[in-house]
Regions:
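Processing junctions and N-termini across compartments
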Residues: 11, 119-122
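The canonical Cys-X-X-Cys-His
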Residues: 121-133
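Extracytoplasmic c-type cytochrome modules immediately beyond a signal peptide or single-pass transmembrane anchor
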Residues: 18-120
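Sec-dependent N-terminal signal peptides
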Residues: 4-13
Length: 134
């Protein structure tokens, strides 16, 4: 009986890894969409999409490391994620904080700060991609 349970667990592991990989790909695509929404909203001066999209990016960034458990390696994810997981966590935290700063500026209508904060947020994405994306 124990052998059957162990075999079932071993067989299920790749499927679990595949599910989390698919989910993180979906969330990264949503992040990309949110960046576009923010950019367009900055052109029109509409703060609501900036606030909402910044909140979504902030939320995902706070959870991002959870979507990279050991054994969930994929073609697009660099091995550096797992060999330097603390660095990866710091990069996700930088992204979270940049999204939070953009959200806060939009909430108080600090339009003059938005371009700089959007660039800061964008740079956290680029920095992480350089280090942790294939």
């Amino acid at each position: 009986m124990k052998k059957k349970i162990l075999l079932l667990i071993i067989i299920s592991l790749p499927a679990l890894g595949s599910e989390i990989i698919d989910k993180r790909k979906q969330l990264f695509q949503e992040n990309k969409d949110h960046m576009r929404f923010i950019y367009k909203a900055m052109q029109s001066g509409d703060m609501d999409p900036i606030i909402n999209s910044s909140m979504a990016i902030e939320k995902f960034a706070s959870e991002m490391p959870e979507y990279f458990p050991e054994g969930s390696e994929s073609r697009g994810a660099s091995d550096n994620i797992w060999s330097d997981f603390e660095g990866f966590i710091k990069s996700a935290k930088a992204n979270q904080l940049a999204a939070q700063k953009l959200k806060l500026a939009a909430q108080v209508n600090e339009i003059e700060k938005l371009n700089g904060l959007f660039n800061e947020l964008s740079n956290t994405c680029k920095s992480c991609h350089r280090s942790y994306k294939n």
